[in-house]
Amino acid sequence: SNKPRPQQVPPRPPHPRL
């Protein structure tokens, strides 16, 4: 049975460290 593939999440830019 073909399982739905999870959508690839684009890598998020690192949040700025304050």
Swiss-Prot record:
Organism: Vespula maculifrons
Transmembrane segments: none
Family: Belongs to the apidaecin family.
Signal peptide: none
Superkingdom as given in the UniProt entry: Eukaryota
Induction per the UniProt record: By bacterial infection.
Biological role: Antimicrobial peptide active against many Gram-negative enterobacterial and plant-associated bacterial species. Not active against other bacterial species like H.pylori, P.mirabilis, B.pertussis or N.gonorrhoeae.
GO biological process, one term: defense response to Gram-negative bacterium
One GO cellular component term: extracellular space
Tagged with keyword Secreted: yes
Keyword Secreted among record annotations: yes
Compartments it resides in: Secreted
Keywords: Antibiotic, Antimicrobial, Immunity, Innate immunity, Secreted
Protein name: Apidaecin +S
